[in-house]
């Protein structure tokens, strides 16, 4: 988790240097040359699609600790506990797919349950079965086992790799509101935030903040995973934060959610969330 925070801070500093060098476009660097409007889908795809799935970690384990999205220890506790998934780049979307929720189910009716398991994107699997444009889920042992009929989890895990179908589903965090973690290394000139517990679509396409006594919304840059960064200053709190989803451009504003006396590594919880629907 400390390494993730250090990486976020380093990337924010790099962004500052790029902003001071006009010939280089910082947005091109972090967006891979794609505009946000081009990357965002007009609607959420609700159809079942084919994919493959494997599992990792302990047989009934929760999956990875942390992961490429930067959620850290959140993946080890409810509501993420045992529901985490590592996905191939086509679903990870350079980190913009972090927080999205999917239903996944296997197809062999002799061993597979008819119900689907719900997983949350918390990590990326970049190689092997996840490479070359494939759609792949590398699930925690617990999530993988839940696709089996009662008592057959061990037999399903023995197969190792499965053909599955998947589709997007609404994220539901059981009454939790959206929270913002101020990443380690943040200052009044380098502010880095990680977004947690977004109901509904779960993915974030853009993020803006507004300072105290200001009417101007400042665009934050997507750095990696679920982390966003603003290089400007001095910044004066309290900060309001506006989120827009990647998939369907739904917006939400958390007013004065980060206080004037904010601290690095602290988490600040809003009083609202997106509707728990797609």
UniProtKB/Swiss-Prot annotation:
<feature type="domain" description="Expansin-like EG45">
    <location>
        <begin position="66"/>
        <end position="176"/>
    </location>
</feature>
<dbReference type="Pfam" id="PF03330">
    <property type="entry name" value="DPBB_1"/>
</dbReference>
<dbReference type="InterPro" id="IPR007118">
    <property type="entry name" value="Expan_Lol_pI"/>
</dbReference>
<dbReference type="GO" id="GO:0009828">
    <property type="term" value="P:plant-type cell wall loosening"/>
</dbReference>
<feature type="disulfide bond">
    <location>
        <begin position="69"/>
        <end position="98"/>
    </location>
</feature>
<protein>
    <recommendedName>
        <fullName>Expansin-B17</fullName>
    </recommendedName>
</protein>
<keyword id="KW-0732">Signal</keyword>
<dbReference type="GO" id="GO:0019953">
    <property type="term" value="P:sexual reproduction"/>
</dbReference>
<feature type="disulfide bond">
    <location>
        <begin position="101"/>
        <end position="171"/>
    </location>
</feature>
<dbReference type="InterPro" id="IPR036749">
    <property type="entry name" value="Expansin_CBD_sf"/>
</dbReference>
<dbReference type="InterPro" id="IPR009009">
    <property type="entry name" value="RlpA-like_DPBB"/>
</dbReference>
<comment type="function">
    <text>May cause loosening and extension of plant cell walls by disrupting non-covalent bonding between cellulose microfibrils and matrix glucans. No enzymatic activity has been found. May be required for rapid internodal elongation in deepwater rice during submergence.</text>
</comment>
<feature type="domain" description="Expansin-like CBD">
    <location>
        <begin position="189"/>
        <end position="270"/>
    </location>
</feature>
<dbReference type="GO" id="GO:0005576">
    <property type="term" value="C:extracellular region"/>
</dbReference>
<keyword id="KW-0961">Cell wall biogenesis/degradation</keyword>
<keyword id="KW-0134">Cell wall</keyword>
<feature type="disulfide bond">
    <location>
        <begin position="106"/>
        <end position="112"/>
    </location>
</feature>
<dbReference type="InterPro" id="IPR005795">
    <property type="entry name" value="LolPI"/>
</dbReference>
<dbReference type="InterPro" id="IPR007112">
    <property type="entry name" value="Expansin/allergen_DPBB_dom"/>
</dbReference>
<dbReference type="InterPro" id="IPR007117">
    <property type="entry name" value="Expansin_CBD"/>
</dbReference>
<dbReference type="GO" id="GO:0016020">
    <property type="term" value="C:membrane"/>
</dbReference>
<feature type="signal peptide">
    <location>
        <begin position="1"/>
        <end position="26"/>
    </location>
</feature>
<keyword id="KW-0964">Secreted</keyword>
<keyword id="KW-1015">Disulfide bond</keyword>
<keyword id="KW-0472">Membrane</keyword>
<dbReference type="GO" id="GO:0006949">
    <property type="term" value="P:syncytium formation"/>
</dbReference>
<comment type="similarity">
    <text>Belongs to the expansin family. Expansin B subfamily.</text>
</comment>
<dbReference type="Pfam" id="PF01357">
    <property type="entry name" value="Expansin_C"/>
</dbReference>
<dbReference type="InterPro" id="IPR036908">
    <property type="entry name" value="RlpA-like_sf"/>
</dbReference>
């Amino acid at each position: 988790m400390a390494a993730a925070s250090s990486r976020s801070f380093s990337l924010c500093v790099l962004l500052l240097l790029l902003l001071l060098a006009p010939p280089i476009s910082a947005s091109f660097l972090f967006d891979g040359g794609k505009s946000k409007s081009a990357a965002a889908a007009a609607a959420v795809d609700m159809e079942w699609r084919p994919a493959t799935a494997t599992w990792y970690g302990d047989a009934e384990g929760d999956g990875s600790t942390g992961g490429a999205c930067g959620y850290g220890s959140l993946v080890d506790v409810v509501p993420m506990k045992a529901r985490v998934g590592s996905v191939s780049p086509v679903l990870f979307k350079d980190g913009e797919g972090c927080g999205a929720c999917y239903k996944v189910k296997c197809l062999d009716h002799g061993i597979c349950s008819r119900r689907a398991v719900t997983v949350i994107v918390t990590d990326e699997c970049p190689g092997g079965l996840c490479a070359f444009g494939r759609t792949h889920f590398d699930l925690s042992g617990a999530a993988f086992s839940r696709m089996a009929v009662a008592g057959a989890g061990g037999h399903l895990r023995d197969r190792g790799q499965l053909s599955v179908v998947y589709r997007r589903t609404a994220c539901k965090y059981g009454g939790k509101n959206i929270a913002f973690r101020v990443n380690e290394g943040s200052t009044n000139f380098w502010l880095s935030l990680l977004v947690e517990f977004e109901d509904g679509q779960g993915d974030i396409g853009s993020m803006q903040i507004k300072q105290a006594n200001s009417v101007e919304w400042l665009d934050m840059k997507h750095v990696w995973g679920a982390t966003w960064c603003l290089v400007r200053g001095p910044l004066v709190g309290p900060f309001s934060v506006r989120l827009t989803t990647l998939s369907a451009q739904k917006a939400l504003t958390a007013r004065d959610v980060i206080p004037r006396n904010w601290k690095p590594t602290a988490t600040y919880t809003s009083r609202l969330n997106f509707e728990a629907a797609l």
